[in-house]
Amino acid sequence: LLQVENLRVSFKNEEKQYIETVKGISFSIPVNTTVALVGESGSGKSVTSLATMGLLPPESSQIALDSKILFEGKNLLDLPRREMRKKCGKDIAMIFQEPMSSLNPVFTVGSQIAEILQLHLGMSRKQARARALELLIEVGIPSPETKIDAYPGQLSGGQQQRVMIAMAIACKPKLLIADEPTTALDVTIQKQILDLLESLRKKHQMSMLFITHDLALVGEIADQVIVMRHGQIREQGRVKDVLERPQDVYTKALLHCRPQLSKRPMRLPMISDFMQQKGDDYIETHTIDVESLQQRSRGLTGQEEIILDVRDLKKSFYSRKGLFGKQEFQAVKGVSFQLAKGKTLGLVGESGSGKTTIGLLLMRLQEATGGKALFEGQDILAMSEKEFARYQRKIQIIFQNPYASLNPRFTVGQILMEPMQVHGIGMNDSERKQMALDLLERVSLPAQAFYRYPHEFSGGQRQRIAIARCLTLKPEVLICDESVSALDVSVQAQVLNLLQDLQDEFGLSYIFISHDLSVVKYISDQIM
C-alpha cells in the first residue's frame, strides 16, 4: 500500500544551512497491516509521517529529489498540492499526538467532524451531522447525542482522542497514521484507545502506521516494527522477532531501560551502558550484564520514622446547577496515609482519580475541604499562610510538564536562585550562584546551563532543572507528579536513577504519583 524509498529530509538551521534529519530510510506498509515506527524524541518518526502527509513546512524543509513515497504506486512527492489535499484526509488520515492542539477550541466536535464529510464526500449539512453522530457512537463516546454539541475543552483527554479518531476514519481511509496517540493517557484509557484502533482497523480493513516511543505498546497492536534513531533505521522486522530476539544493540538497550514488574535493580540500565558514540557512528560497549545486576530491597519494616501523616483528607469542587443551586463533586474522599522518612510512597490511579489533587492539597496550592496533614507533628492544613511559609520549603513538588513549569523568560540561573532569594538561603547572590552551579552538577547538567533559557533544553534536561530547583530549598519531602511520564524510555531511566541517588544521598522522602505500574513498583516502598 505504502512504499517509502530512500527518504531524506533536511531542515534549515539558524545559519540558513540545511541539516539532514531523516537519512535515507526505506520501508513498506502492506495492505491491512499495522506497522509500528519506534524511536525516541528526535529520531525522525514524526518527520517521516508529516512527509507522507505533505505537511512539512516548505519554507524551512526540503526532501531529496531521489526520495519516493509511493501510495498505491503513485509518488506522493510528485503530486500537485491540490491533488495531495484531496488524498490526505480521504485516503490517508492522521491522528496527532496532542488532541487539544489539533481540535479547534471554538467549534463543537460535531461541526468539526461534519466539516470533513462535507469537504471530502460532498454531504449536505444534515447528512454530515447524522454521520458525525454515527461516528461518535462508533468510537465509543458516552452520551454522543449531547457530546456532539460539546466543545473540545469540555471533554476529557481520552474523549478528545476518540473525537480525533472519529475525524480520521470519517472518510474510510486506506491508511491511518497514528502519531503517539496514547502518550498522555493513563494505562486504562491507553488500552481502550489501542483496542479501539485495532477493532476499527479490522472493521474498515485499513493499514496503520503506529508511531510511538514505547516498545511495550508495540506488541499489543503491531504486526511489524521499525526501530529508528537519529534519522536512521536501526532494525526492522516482525514484532515477535524484534522484541524477543533483537539484533541491534540500540533495540536491546531500549528494551532493558524500561522498568520491569519482576525486577528491581539498584540502578536502571541506560543507553550509554550498551553503546557509545564514536564520530557519527556508535560502537557497542556492553559495560553491564543486565541479568546479574544487584537488586534493591523495597518495603517497610514498621520501625521507620513517620515524616508525614495524612488523615481523612477531603476535597470538593462545586459547579453551578440551575440559577441558584450548586452541585458538589468530591475529588478526594477521606484519604489517609503515612509517609516514612527516606522512603517512597507510590500513588497509582487513572486520570481523575484524585492523585494530583492530593499533591496540590499538601502543597496548599488548593485548600482542603477537610482532614489533617501532620508534618513533624504540626497540621500544615490548619496553618495560616504566614506559618505555612516556614514549612513550604520542606515540601516541594516536581510537576508533570517541564515545558510549562519553568519560566521561559528566566535563565536557568535565575530559576534556581529565585527560591533561595525568597527564602533567604545563602549570604549573597555569589554564594547562591555557587550553590546553583553545584546543583546543576549534581543533576548532571553542564555549568553553561546556568546562562541558558529553558527552551534550549530537551524534556529530560528540563525535568532535571525542575528537580534542581526543588533541591535549592533543601526539602525533606518531594512530590513527584507524573514527573517521568512524558519522557522517552532512556531519559526516564536517567531521571529515575537520579531520583534514587538523591534519596540515598539526602534521605529524601517521595510521594511518587504515576499511572505507570512498572515505574511505581520499581521506585516505591509502599503503594496506594
Residue ranges and their predicted role:
Residues Q127-T146, D379, S430-Q448:
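Conserved ABC ATPase "signature" region
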Residues P142-T146, V239-L308, S319-L323:
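Short catalytic/signature loops enriched in Gly
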